[in-house]
Amino acid sequence: MAHLVKMENGQSQTIQEMLGCIERYNPDHLKILESYVQDQAKNNTYDLEANLAVLKLYQFNPHMLNFDITYTILLKCLTNLPHTDFVMAKCLLLPQQMKDENVQTIIDLADILERADFTLFWQRAEVNRTMFRHITGFHDSIRKFVSHVVGTTFQTIKKDLLKELLGGIEDSTLENWIKRNGWKHQGHDLVVVATQDDKIKTKNITEKIEFENVGALMAQCI
């Protein structure tokens, strides 16, 4: 569903158009933006710029602060790891948001993901599962991030460990993630994540440095 914002002149703009002008800081549009955040959670879509605009409006209008929307924005940021969206959102939080117990729980979950302690993350996620059950695709988004880390860390990995890192998934679900990432089986208990050909190859980089760039420095050394 398209979200339209009504301007003072009676005309309507899309959210993207509104975010490109000074109207993004108009508190009259906050309810529309909050509804847009809820739609992102429901429909498994994501709009970082709009979500950050909501947090910025909370900064300007603390009396309009909505904690449930804050939780949803932070959790949606987690679904876009390894990008730094969560850090940007966290920097916009008000002191009263930072002191909130649920916000602290989400920050803890983010820290756990950042240090790649995925087993602990899934344990904590199970304890706090009601917090993000309204966010469609949350678990698979985290598994996508886990797959990214596994792909940059391992050449081969045991199936049981991979299942654990992906949240204790069933064999059939594991097969889907193996195919999705282009991984291959090796024997009965190993998964090949990267072959020898997949390794990063060294590359010679030549940079042209003009004399004018170092002339002043050389003169100081004489």
UniProtKB/Swiss-Prot annotation:
Keyword Cell membrane: no
Pfam hit, one: CSN8_PSD8_EIF3K
Subcellular location(s) of the protein: Cytoplasm
Alphabetically ordered keywords of this record: Cytoplasm, Initiation factor, Protein biosynthesis
Highest taxon above the source species: Eukaryota
GO BP, sorted A to Z: formation of cytoplasmic translation initiation complex; regulation of translational initiation
Cellular component GO terms, alphabetical: eukaryotic 43S preinitiation complex; eukaryotic 48S preinitiation complex; eukaryotic translation initiation factor 3 complex
An MF annotation (GO) of this entry: RNA binding
PANTHER family attached to this UniProt entry: EUKARYOTIC TRANSLATION INITIATION FACTOR 3 SUBUNIT 11, EUKARYOTIC TRANSLATION INITIATION FACTOR 3 SUBUNIT K
HAMAP family: eIF3k
Function comment: Component of the eukaryotic translation initiation factor 3 (eIF-3) complex, which is involved in protein synthesis of a specialized repertoire of mRNAs and, together with other initiation factors, stimulates binding of mRNA and methionyl-tRNAi to the 40S ribosome. The eIF-3 complex specifically targets and initiates translation of a subset of mRNAs involved in cell proliferation.
Record text on subunit structure and interactions: Component of the eukaryotic translation initiation factor 3 (eIF-3) complex. The eIF-3 complex interacts with pix.
Protein name: Eukaryotic translation initiation factor 3 subunit K
